[in-house]
């Protein structure tokens, strides 16, 4: 990836794959080790309990509760938004397969929304505003702001075809 965020995701997967191949190779399962290692990646997860800094829904809630405008960094950026329960269902499927000792599932997996579920930051704000009219926002025009990719999406073809997993809720 061009920016540190997307590069960090790729690096994490590469590191996990390297670790799996070196120490928990599936060809050596039950011979030299008893560990199956899979990695799972989700889209931009929203849902209860996420109060981390620079999270869109969190920023909206905090700004409204303080009577402030929400500052939007990149309104035209498209993200793979999904409720926390969506990827969790995929994670549980992978966990079940690993518990069943199905070594072919010890790989990297993506769990994200369909292409139709990827909408812009501004569309998310507008959707929330439809249900909570107290929301007012402004576009952050900071010229020193760090680079962010305009489009993030996940290829979930493997999860869709092999696990028959798909997202249920729309954005």
Which stretches of residues belong to each language-model region?
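Conserved protein kinase catalytic core
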Residues: 47
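Short, flexible, glycine-rich and Lys/Arg-enriched loop motifs at helix boundaries
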Residues: 1, 23-28, 101-105, 114
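A generic local structural motif
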Residues: 26, 57-58, 137-139
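Active-site Tyr-X1-5-Lys
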Residues: 2-38, 64-66
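Non-catalytic, surface-exposed connector residues within folded enzymatic/regulatory domains
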Residues: 31-34, 50, 54, 102-105, ...
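C-terminal substrate-binding subdomain of Rossmann-fold SDR/epimerase-dehydratase oxidoreductases
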Residues: 39, 44, 64-171
